[in-house]
Amino acid sequence: MIYPKTYDVIVVGGGHAGTEAALAAARMGAQTLLLTHNIETLGQMSCNPSIGGIGKGHLVRELDALGGAMALATDKSGIQFRRLNASKGAAVRATRAQADRILYKATIREMLENQENLDLFQQAVEDVTLDGERISGVVTAMGVEFKARAVVLTAGTFLSGKIHIGLENYEGGRAGDPAAKSLGGRLRELNLPQGRLKTGTPPRIDGRTIDFSQLTEQPGDTPVPVMSVRGSADMHPRQVSCWITHTNTQTHDIIRSGFDRSPMFTGKIEGVGPRYCPSIEDKINRFADKDSHQIFLEPEGLTTHEYYPNGISTSLPFDIQIALVRSMKGLENAHILRPGYAIEYDYFDPRNLKASLETKTIQGLFFAGQINGTTGYEEAAAQGLLAGANAVQYVREQDPLLLRREQAYLGVLVDDLITKGVNEPYRMFTSRAEYRLQLREDNADMRLTEDGYKIGLVGEAQWRMFNEKREAIEREIQRLKTTWYTPQKLAEDEQIRVFGQKLSREANLHDLLRRPNLDYAALMTLEGAMPSERLSAEVVEQVEIQVKYQGYIDRQNEEIDSRRDIETLKLPDGIDYGKVKGLSAEVQQKLNQHKPETVGQASRISGVTPAAVALLMVHLKRGFKDAK
């Protein structure tokens, strides 16, 4: 049957990408349908019970700046918060939280059920329908056809998923859930370029069988950090500690003894796993000289005894899993609640996507999350929001939301995917960004909220809070510039106390704050230095960073401006680069293969030289007359 209601946007999949995509589309006013094989698993944390971290936390803040759900849901479910790299430069400081997975899932479910313009339906999708080269809808397992002008696919690890434990394997999307075999087969029929990747998860441990007296405690930070600009510490549930243990030489010997039954070493697994989140057997094999690896025991929630041992993801046989866990300090009597496993799944080459995350071959079909070759909740959620928003822009025939590399980590993520593709699961790091001083956690709202508000992603309450913060920052910076001190105005002992030396000349607070040995709090102890209005910690942080890093930021802005022309310069559709005179055969081949949308994208394709970019600029001015 054909369902009687036609939707603007259909989202397939209810993980982190799918929920953000559906919420984004519905916030923008589009009639949206979220289809999931099981409503009870909406927003489920399939692997580790944590959100954020270096690079990943930056993405969460960007999601939040665009009205997304992940940061706020983390504030409502986070049971431990830490600020990573707190003593380092502002660019690499990041927030990480342990989340109660039951609370997190319940919070996302509540957001979905209370979102206007959003319908939910429980049924696996087995087919997509086309009208020529345009998407027209989807068909579920029981034959219901839902019509829509745009579809966002966020299938995660479910497409032709296969789970491995030792030499045993079976079809599945994750433990306890079926694979999307029919949908995976249908997408292959559409000749979308695809491949296989692998990820894994560790065994879960019953906390009642852990000897915590043998472990090192790792408490959260005080004061407790907050993830969302709409959140507060008052939202946080009870806070708890994580715990640290280590592998040892006995552990490593046990792991090696299982190599002959490992699906990874016996060739049972074909997909490539994540380089930066390797299995414990991969670590022992690659770093054979290391006698020990640190393992974090992370609580799964406040109402369960389950612990997640971060660092021992494995697909080794279950008897080896038991032995390796019990070989570690504090875990001698540990009971495993769930075995670790690896999962192989289909992904689709993201070089077949536009910067909007729409496929180049099927109009109105958008991909987000692990289907694009990424790994991680945060990477998936960020893509989901962008794909959901751009699906609405597509339906409305309006320009897509495109984020530049110097504007957002989400811009870096998408640009890396669509220009370079992936040969292993892609994870975000701050080192992937050329302009990371611009892309700090603390200024995500300053970079993105205005763009989000313009297209309806950001609500009025968040927009009002943003403007109040922005204006407070501007007022305080201006006040610092107009508050002057002379050597005669301050007592000599006060000058030495605050500045470490006597003032040699008149200076304002703005110039004094730029000194490397001075911070805002110390300056405010000067007589007459305190502002008349009470400033939030977030405003003070922004003021201090903007003032102290102004010279570096200005230099980066000059570099960005010098590249902006080539970054945004559009390349026409339908160019046969084989006919573009002067380009080498390698460059012609790679440009035809990747089909970049802009000169900036072309410049980042491996093998495309600066000389080739200059030649493209010349041909662009002439209109590529010979190449159409």
From Swiss-Prot:
Entry cofactors: FAD
Gene Ontology terms describing biological process: tRNA methylation; tRNA wobble uridine modification
Keyword NAD applies: yes
SMART domains linked: GIDA_assoc_3
Record: residues binding NAD(+): 273-287
Transmembrane segments: none
UniProt name for this protein: tRNA uridine 5-carboxymethylaminomethyl modification enzyme MnmG
Top-level lineage group: Bacteria
GO molecular function: flavin adenine dinucleotide binding
Family: Belongs to the MnmG family.
Keywords: Cytoplasm, FAD, Flavoprotein, NAD, tRNA processing
Subcellular location: Cytoplasm
Family matches, as InterPro entries: FAD/NAD-bd_sf, GIDA_C_N, MnmG, MnmG-rel, MnmG-rel_CS, MnmG_C, MnmG_C_subdom, MnmG_C_subdom_sf
Quaternary structure, from the entry: Homodimer. Heterotetramer of two MnmE and two MnmG subunits.
A single Gene Ontology CC term: cytosol
Binding site for FAD: 13-18
Function comment: NAD-binding protein involved in the addition of a carboxymethylaminomethyl (cmnm) group at the wobble position (U34) of certain tRNAs, forming tRNA-cmnm(5)s(2)U34.
